[in-house]
Structures are given as structure tokens and as C-alpha cells.
């Protein structure tokens, strides 16, 4: 194995990792035969059971017999659940190996491996998904149909990092990459799977502290996995995460984790037509706290020409251009901007509004980007045959 922990600039950290750390790593073939783990698994499971905890086994193999044998061994050791790792990015770099994320990119293979494992054991089976594909939802559907009790969303991406001072790739070449920066990407799939399939989810990839754990839960995860941050900060970081979650629940009045599961996912819009049909807002600038012209960052970042400086040096808001995107609100360092709801009467006064009918279905359905409509509307495919 090779590990490389970097800051957001790509430099190796020297000391405690910041919240935006990047964890770049590569693991090779296991040097330990899986049956050599049996004493440790039994001891760990007994220790956990005495303390009301659970141990979930993790399996990866090069052929179907290996998958079944390892999972049966995990069950025989008394573990209550096993995870099939269809997300590991490393097998793609191992000559002659077809496993990990390679299986996780093929719905048919993922289905069959999951089906045979589920038939071989009596404990619940979950599947760890890979982000190195365009359709994790399809894999989640396939493994659910094959008998999986849930999925883990989501494993590490495959990356490539360069040391520009030496011109060399970090740790030799492509490797798995994760860290808190990837959390929004992970949360996307947690949300989608929760929304579309409603199946149990173990959230993973992007956790630093308790606030990240809570985000995963509110996106739809029923449990979470914490790995990279424990490797760089030590196992003693885990109790701090748990304590933080408990303190947050007490502060906000949540009686159980179940009350938080999928909370944000259920409140999410389904598509952009719903997003823009909600109440319109516009920016309002407080001249008493605004520091323009010393600071005019809001004017600089507004792509819609909705803000300008008037002759007196204060900020004018052009409500006919302000679409309510809130970028000025986010970048203002003096908290001088707020967004106010646009009243219906203000639209008649020229305040910006979404043009009527813009999201009508036929506007998007007339020419879809598929081969049938492309061919139908392309002169190349519609030439009369030569006589």
C-alpha cells in the first residue's frame, strides 16, 4: 500500500490535516489469506456483541467461488452482515484481476455475484457501489433485485495526482482518492438512491466530523462509514464524532436518528421546473453596513448586471435583472445583503420573473437527444436515395 495525504493545494500535509484534506492511496494484493483472519473476526465480533455494537464483514474476490467462500466464512465467524465490495478502485490496476469497481460498473455481473452470495449465506448482504461510472442507480437496482438488503454509497473515485516540482505522479500513478471535498458527490447518490429506491443505505466517502455524518443521514443514509479521517487523525477521533452527533440531536430536539434519515432528501425539489416555480426572491442591500466602494465584490460577481454603483457610492439593485441566485449574499463579507420575497404585485412593476410557459413539456419534448430524433432532424440521414 501507498498513502499520500495532501492539502487543497496538493502539497503533502505536515502535521494535523485540515478539513479539506485529500487522501490519495493505493492498495495491492492482500498478503494475508482470508482464513487467517478467522481468530481475529471471532474475537472482534465477541467484543462488539458484549458492548452492543455490530461488526460488518467486507468481501472481495477474484471469482464467484471466492466471493461465496469468504462470505460463508464471515457468517461462520458470527458476523451479522457482509458487504460485497463492488466499489474498490484498485483491481482495475491489477493485471488479470476483474473485481471491485470493475464489477460495480456491470449491472449483469453485479446482479449475478450478489444473487449467488445471497443464496449462499443467511445473513444480510449489502453492496458497496463505485462512483467510477455514470449510473450507480442502475447497479443499486440490480443488486436489490438479486437480494441485497442495502447498498453503501459510495466508494472512492480513481484519481491521478501530479507533483509539479518533480514532474512525477504521486505514489507512482493512478490511485483511489477521497476526502471531505468529495462529500457533495457522495451525497448526490445517497439522495438519489433514497429517493428512487427507498432501500437502506450506508453513507460513505467525505466524512470529517459529526456534521458530515448528519448530512449523510439527512440525505438518506441509515448508517455511515468512517475510514480516511480515522487513518489520518487516529481512532480516538471516532468517539468525538459520536459525541458530536448526540450533542446535535439534543440541541435540535431529535429523539432518534430515524427522525433525521432522509429529512433533506424528502424536502428536495424533483427537477428544475419545481425549483423555479417556487417563490421568487430579489436582493436588498443595507447601505448602513455596506462598505462599497472599498468593497464591491457583489458587483464583480453578479453575472446578471443586477448590481451597480450609483453616483453617491452606494449599491443599486436592478430588480428587473436580479434573478435571486443569492451569489451576492454568499460573497458579501459584511452581511449587508438579504434576499426578500418578490410579491406578486412587484412583477407588474418590472421585477424579474420566469417567463410564462418556459417549463411546458412540449418545449423539451420536441427534439430529444437520442438517435431517433437526431436522425429524423438531420439532413445527413434524410437524403433521398440516389436513383
Locations of regions flagged by a protein language model:
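C-terminal accessory/binding modules appended to enzymatic or scaffolding proteins
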Residues: 279-312, 316
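Alpha/beta enzyme core
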Residues: 50, 62-202, 208-223, 270-274, ...
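Short secondary-structure boundary segments
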Residues: 1-3, 86, 155, 228-229
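Extended, hydrophobic interaction surfaces within ordered domains
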Residues: 192-197, 212-268, 317, 323, ...
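Flanking helices and flexible, charged tails adjoining ferredoxin-like Fe-S electron-transfer domains
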Residues: 247-255, 259-278, 287-288, 297-299, ...
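N-terminal capping/small domains of soluble enzymes
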Residues: 1-72, 384-386
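C-terminal helical cap(s) of enzyme catalytic domains, especially alpha/beta-barrels
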Residues: 6-19, 162-178, 229-254, 348-358
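Short beta->alpha connector loops at strand-helix junctions that form conserved
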Residues: 1, 205, 227-228, 340
